Design a protein with these regions (language model features):
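Non-catalytic accessory regions of SAM-dependent methyltransferases
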Residues: 1-119
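A short interface-forming secondary-structure element
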Residues: 119-132
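Non-catalytic substrate-recognition/targeting regions of SAM-dependent transferases
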Residues: 103-116, 135-211
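Conserved hydrophobic/aromatic pocket- or pore-lining residues that grip, position, or stack substrates
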Residues: 120, 199, 218, 235
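Conserved class I S-adenosyl-L-methionine
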Residues: 228-235
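Glycine-rich helix-loop-beta junction characteristic of Rossmann-like nucleotide cofactor-binding loops
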Residues: 221-227
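Single conserved hydrophobic/aromatic residue that forms the stacking wall/gate
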Residues: 237-248
């Protein structure tokens, strides 16, 4: 159990997902194993949440739950994956599900985990030791969830080639996640459809997780403005074929 000061208590009660090293008043006599779950309480002992402990980061605890009755077994994580996917389906047009962010880190209470879906490939970035420890629970379950919903998943690529991992004591690297009983895909290139435009996405070598999904609505706005015109994009990263923008 980690006891925190009044400042951290206010932040956590307000929804903040992190506990910083300098906000901790009392820690266990023996430090927990790196990446394991610990409880966080106020100065007076009030339960504030449970999260992953990190011995290397200044973010000492990343919360995953504020419910003292939760049991953190595989079923817990499967429910959270299901909720995140169902939420995306509820707020997005069906056509947008071809390429979308499924897991958005702390916003989905998966601290340090990003999962982007590019048609039949998942691009995964793990930035916290807690998520690293349970990825073998999460990733096969997520592939199974999507397949059961009619979305063929050919493979999962780990895009852990980011320096931020070193702050958690994790190595950098990238490569295919070994789904049980499945061979690694032959190619990390896939075709997605966004706003009616087809793009070839290189999930392994594209910037960040492979493609700037957060620019979807900006590209849609540019398409409306550029209709009937020839457009020169001086900062072009991805080229679509066919394209509605008339890019040269």
């Amino acid at each position: 159990v980690y006891k925190v000061n009044k400042h951290a208590e206010g932040l956590l009660v307000g929804g903040h997902p992190w506990v910083y090293e300098n906000d901790i008043l009392e820690a266990p006599g023996t430090a927990p194993e790196n990446g394991t779950l610990v409880d966080v309480v106020s100065k007076k002992g009030r339960y504030l949440g449970t999260g992953f402990f990190s011995e290397h980061s200044k973010i000492r605890v990343r919360l995953i739950s504020r419910n003292a009755n939760d049991r953190f077994d595989a079923a817990f994580w499967h429910r959270k994956l299901q909720w995140a996917w169902e939420y995306r389906k509820s707020v997005m047009d069906p056509a947008d599900l071809d390429a979308c962010r499924i897991i958005f880190g702390e916003a989905d209470a998966f601290p340090g985990l990003t999962v982007d879906k590019f048609h039949d490939l998942l691009s995964v970035q793990v930035l916290s030791v807690g998520m690293e420890r349970i990825q073998d629970i999460l990733l096969p379950a997520l592939a199974e969830l999507l397949r059961a919903d009619g979305f063929p998943i050919r493979g999962i690529l780990l895009r852990n080639d980011v320096a931020l991992r070193e702050k958690e004591g994790l190595p950098q690297g990238k490569g295919w996640y070994p789904l049980p009983g499945e061979a690694a895909p032959d190619s990390a290139v896939t075709e997605i459809t966004e706003n009616g435009v087809k793009y070839l996405v290189d999930v392994e070598n594209g910037q960040k997780t492979g493609f700037f999904l957060d620019q979807k609505y900006n590209r849609r706005a540019v398409a409306r403005l550029a209709a009937g015109h020839t457009v020169l994009d001086l900062s072009l990263i991805h080229i679509s074929e066919p394209t509605r923008l008339g890019m040269i």
